[in-house]
């Protein structure tokens, strides 16, 4: 729960305040984080915060936004190393699936056992 402050771009007032220093989190919020949060909402207009959830939209781990695309769309439910239907693994809230990356950057090597390797190896 406390990590959500970081995902909402709310900065701590002091460098010493981290998610592990529980006593710092609320003091940072009350001093100026609410202004940063308001700026974030107004400037970035994050869909998952502003959009109303539909009752029929559901992710593997619960409700998500209208345009939910994958398991990693909800960063706090994505644990590093979590398998993604045998296509890849969650990493820092993202779903780096090698097949999709190789399709974009070196589509001619998709049939190889190690996609992208021939494309990036010195010849």
Curated annotation (Swiss-Prot):
Domain spans labelled Disintegrin: 53-80
Peptidase M12B domain sequence ranges: 6-52
Disulfide bonds: 19-24, 59-65, 64-78, 72-90, 106-116
EC number: 3.4.24.-
Annotated residues for binding of Ca(2+): 48, 51
Localization annotation: Secreted
PTM text: The N-terminus is blocked.
Keyword Nucleotide-binding assigned: no
Binding annotation for Zn(2+): 12
Co-factor: note: Binds 1 zinc ion per subunit.
Highest taxon listed in the record's lineage: Eukaryota
Other facts noted in the record for this chain: Negative results: does not activate human prothrombin.
Protein name: Zinc metalloproteinase-disintegrin-like jerdohagin
Species, as recorded: Protobothrops jerdonii (Jerdon's pitviper)
